[in-house]
């Protein structure tokens, strides 16, 4: 069993935010961080790794410097990082991004007992679409907005807490 985590490098909006004349983020002039919600998914994956003894693989699509983010995740305990990069992928919308990442995961190999985790949404777009679109492309069941992942024997179980 392995746990695959989809992660994204995003602009650090806690500091100075640079904006282009057209109102879009000037990403080139901003520092980057691991998307906070994706970090939650990584932490859940690492907790399951400790309980189940499985392998954790992080996937990202981005420019070559995103390799640094993957190295940071590996220092935290992720076993392997996969960077999908090509100049043509720059500026991809959520659909294109999810199709590309899903193809990378499919090529890497997904077994029937594997789990794919993704953070709720990225702070630079707030769409919450890529994770569910990856699951759909790979014909996998999905649970969104999971509040907790525990195990029942050797089977991970997800709980979603709904609030009114």
Please report, for each region that a protein language model flagged, where it lies by residue:
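Positively charged, low-complexity intrinsically disordered leader regions
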Residues: 1-18
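Residues at the starts of beta-strands that form the adenosine-phosphate
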Residues: 2, 53-57, 80
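Short, glycine-rich nucleotide/cofactor-binding loops
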Residues: 8, 26-40
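Histidine-anchored nucleotide/phosphate-binding helix
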Residues: 38-49
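A glycine-rich helix N-cap at a beta->alpha junction
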Residues: 69-96
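Glycine-rich phosphate-binding loop signature in dinucleotide/nucleotide-binding domains
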Residues: 107-113
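Short Gly/Thr/Asp-enriched flexible loops that form oxyanion-binding sites at enzyme active sites
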Residues: 125-138, 142
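Conserved small/polar residues in nucleotide/adenosyl-binding loops
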Residues: 160-164
